[in-house]
């Protein structure tokens, strides 16, 4: 059985809250929702599915704890891993760097041999620019809980459903498969 680990970097608690919400919707226990500042190579090795969440700070900068987290990921064997990204940003005040932190992590892991899932269309977002967008798709779930908090739950639900559908063909621990209703 494969395990899902959720690693997040959060300075104000928003990304942590999003990570916990995603965990709840996927049935991932709280013990597998980990602050990236505590992440090490053994933890990365333990999970075959990694959900990586970050906020974006300043002028498109990665959340501080992720700088060491990215080093751990680069030193880890990610070839057999399935990875999904989620990011928090402010599309109004920082419309030119919306969710760039997620794009930075993507750039650092994209050539590692991992399988990246959970891309989201950028068409329903209002922003100017983001390095987290490639060919009209965010590299993961982009959230603006400051200006579009009314869309957060719906966006998380759609993304979690996409992740579940992708992973449904393989048996994973902690994964609650979608029901037909």
Task: Identify the role of each PLM range.
Residues 173-179:
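Conserved small/polar residues in nucleotide/adenosyl-binding loops
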Residues 14, 18, 155, 173:
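Charged catalytic carboxylate motif
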Residues 35-40:
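Short acidic loop-to-helix transition motifs that present clustered carboxylates
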Residues 3, 25, 29, 34, ...:
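FMN-binding flavodoxin-like domain, especially the glycine-rich phosphate-binding loop
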Residues 4-21:
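N-terminal beta1-alpha1 ligand-phosphate binding loop
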């Amino acid at each position: 059985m494969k395990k899902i680990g959720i690693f997040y970097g959060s300075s104000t608690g928003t990304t942590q809250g999003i990570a916990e919400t995603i965990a709840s919707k996927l049935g991932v226990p709280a013990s597998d929702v980990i602050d990236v500042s505590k992440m090490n190579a053994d933890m990365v090795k333990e999970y075959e599915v990694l959900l990586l969440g970050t906020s974006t700070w300043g002028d498109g900068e990665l959340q501080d704890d992720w700088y060491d987290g990215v080093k751990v990921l680069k030193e880890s064997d990610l070839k057999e891993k399935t990875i999904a990204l989620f990011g928090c940003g402010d599309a109004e005040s920082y419309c030119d760097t919306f969710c760039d932190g997620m794009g930075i992590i993507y750039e650092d892991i994209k050539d590692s041999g991992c399988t990246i899932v959970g891309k989201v269309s950028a068409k329903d977002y209002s922003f100017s620019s983001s390095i987290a967008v490639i060919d009209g798709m965010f590299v993961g779930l982009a959230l603006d809980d400051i200006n579009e908090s009314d869309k957060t739950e719906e966006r998380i639900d759609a993304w979690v459903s996409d992740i579940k559908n992708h992973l449904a063909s393989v048996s994973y621990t902690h994964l609650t498969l979608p029901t037909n209703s």
